Every structure is written in C-alpha cells, then in structure tokens.
C-alpha cells in the first residue's frame, strides 16, 4: 500500500457543509503531522488556513493522495485534471447520491484514519476522450469519466446523425442525441435514459439513444477499445453540442465529426475496505426497497 504523507484537498465551491468538512479535514491532518496542500480555489473557502496552496495540476505533481470534498460532480472535475498524474483520489460525500464519493462526513475521521494506515482498496476507472472536427480540422477536445453526450443544446429540434463503430456504419438516426457512457457513467445520465448498469471493472462503453424517432433503437454495449464516430447530418437545422460529464460543452455544426475513444490512462480511486459496488447500488438506487403502506 502507498504511504501517504503529502495530501491535497479539493472542495466544491459555495457549500457551507463542504466548508465544515474542509475545516475538519485540515484540523485532523495537520494534527497528525501530514503535509496538507489545498487547491487554490478551495483555499478561498477557509480564510486563514495557513496551508500551502497549489493548482490542481500542481497537486497531481506533489501529492501522494488527493481528497475531494463534495458530490460526484466535484470528483468528476478533479479526476479529469488529475488522471494523467495517476495520483489516487478519495471522495468525501457532501453531495446527493455519492456513487464515487463514498466516505460519509459523520464518520470522516475514523474512516480516513484507516485509509491513511493503509487499510483501503483501490480500483481504476477509465475515461473517454472526445475530439470534434470541422472541415478536416480540429475544433475542440474534452475528456470525461462519466459520459460524452451529443445533445441539442437549447433547441428542441431533433438531431440527425450517422453512427460508426471502428469504421463500420451502424445507423443513421434522428433523436435528441446520444449518450456515450463508461461503466462509471452507467449509473448516471445513461441510467436515466434507459441504459444498463455496468460493473466498473468492465472494459466496455454503452451507447444510449435519447428519444429516438424509431421503435427499434436500443442501447448498444461495445468494446471499450472501440472508436466511436458521430457525423452530424449536413441538413440539420439545429446546431447541437457535445458535453463532457455535463461540465464542458463544444458547440457543433452540420457536417462536424465527433470521435470518441478510451483515454490511454486511468484514474485511481481509493475506497474503505467495506466498499462494495452492489451494496452501493442497493443503497443509492433503492434496490429491494418496499413501498410503504399509507
């Protein structure tokens, strides 16, 4: 197990509860002689902290562990920036569901102590890269831990596009768009659109149509190493967008090409030893819960 001495802290902005956990983390870690580095935006949330301040990029270079305080969205943002550094990430849940941020604030110090003593499990999750081309030239790029989504933006018109997988034509479709999700993202937007839940260890990607104008279109699960290409129809009257984890958007135009592939490196997630994917699904999604009688 890794020995953690230099620990970075990243928090979601604008939350009183996050501030409470940040203060608790800072007090606990400094009292136990850990070198704590706080992310530069996060540092503004706790004035007078007296800690070293660094950008997310620098955290990836100088830390042994980064703790993210917030919801799954906060961890998604940190993961995209820290993936290349291969630094382990631990999540403290101050959001809603908490599929990725699985340490509860109520027992933060107890659970954190065990992790820092080496009592934890580690798993890797892959990300997606998305490249948008226009007239054969690069237009934009993004990465995603959950999903890359083609959507109509503010328009209510359908999008016409062609789908290719590994160079093979799959179909032409008119719909509200397409969700391309990792196993991590299969419990997020993809799930809401009728996609399957995939175990995080699967090397696979799911393609989920959004309100397709057909009765036969269904989600497709493909090899994680596949290259997915979307070609936006030339006759589209709408200008769709491509989003990455719902946090970054690239505006597209008719004729643009979107290429989606697996990122060459993965993120490292740290969990308490009692972490279990099925238990998480049961708890967060309400599996096997009974309807209470009125």
Swiss-Prot record:
Residues given in the record as NAD(+) binding sites: 72-73, 146-147, 157, 174, 176, 187-192, 247
GO BP, one annotated term: NAD metabolic process
Catalytic activity, reaction form: NAD(+) + ATP = ADP + NADP(+) + H(+)
Pfam families referenced in this protein's UniProt entry, alphabetically: NAD_kinase, NAD_kinase_C
SUPFAM superfamilies: NAD kinase/diacylglycerol kinase-like
Main subcellular location: cytoplasm
Keywords tagged on the record: ATP-binding, Cytoplasm, Kinase, NAD, NADP, Nucleotide-binding, Transferase
Cell compartment(s), UniProt: Cytoplasm
EC number, UniProt record: 2.7.1.23
Membership in a protein family: Belongs to the NAD kinase family.
PANTHER family, A to Z: NAD KINASE (PTHR20275:SF0)
Role, per record: Involved in the regulation of the intracellular balance of NAD and NADP, and is a key enzyme in the biosynthesis of NADP. Catalyzes specifically the phosphorylation on 2'-hydroxyl of the adenosine moiety of NAD to yield NADP.
Protein name, UniProt field: NAD kinase
Organism lineage: Bacteria, Pseudomonadati, Pseudomonadota, Gammaproteobacteria, Pseudomonadales
């Amino acid at each position: 197990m890794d020995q953690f001495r230099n620990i970075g802290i990243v928090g979601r902005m604008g939350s009183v509860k996050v501030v409470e956990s940040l203060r608790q983390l800072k007090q606990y870690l400094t009292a136990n002689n850990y070198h704590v580095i706080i992310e530069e935006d996060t540092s503004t949330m706790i004035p007078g902290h007296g800690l070293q301040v660094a950008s997310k990029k620098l955290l990836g270079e100088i830390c042994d562990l980064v703790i993210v305080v917030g919801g799954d969205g906060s961890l998604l943002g940190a993961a995209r920036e820290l993936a290349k550094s291969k630094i382990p990430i631990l999540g403290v849940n101050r959001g809603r569901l908490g599929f990725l941020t699985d340490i509860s604030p109520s027992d933060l110090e107890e659970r954190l102590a065990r992790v820092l003593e080496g009592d934890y499990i580690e798993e890797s999750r892959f990300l997606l890269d998305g490249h948008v081309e226009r007239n054969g030239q690069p237009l934009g790029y993004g990465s995603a831990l959950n999903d890359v989504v083609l959507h109509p933006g503010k328009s209510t018109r359908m999008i016409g596009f062609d789908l290719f997988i590994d160079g093979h034509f799959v179909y032409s479709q008119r719909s509200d768009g397409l969700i391309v999700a990792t196993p991590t993202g299969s419990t997020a937007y993809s799930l809401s659109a009728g996609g399957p839940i995939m175990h995080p260890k699967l090397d696979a990607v799911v393609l989920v149509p959004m309100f397709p104008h057909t009765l036969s279109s269904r989600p497709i699960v493909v090899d994680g190493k596949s290259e997915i290409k979307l070609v936006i129809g030339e006759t589209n009257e709408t200008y769709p967008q491509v989003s990455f984890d719902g946090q970054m958007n690239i505006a597209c135009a008719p004729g643009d090409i979107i290429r989606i592939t697996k990122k060459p490196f993965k993120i490292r997630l740290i969990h308490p030893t009692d972490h279990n994917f099925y238990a998480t699904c049961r708890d967060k999604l309400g599996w096997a819960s009974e309807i209470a009688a009125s």
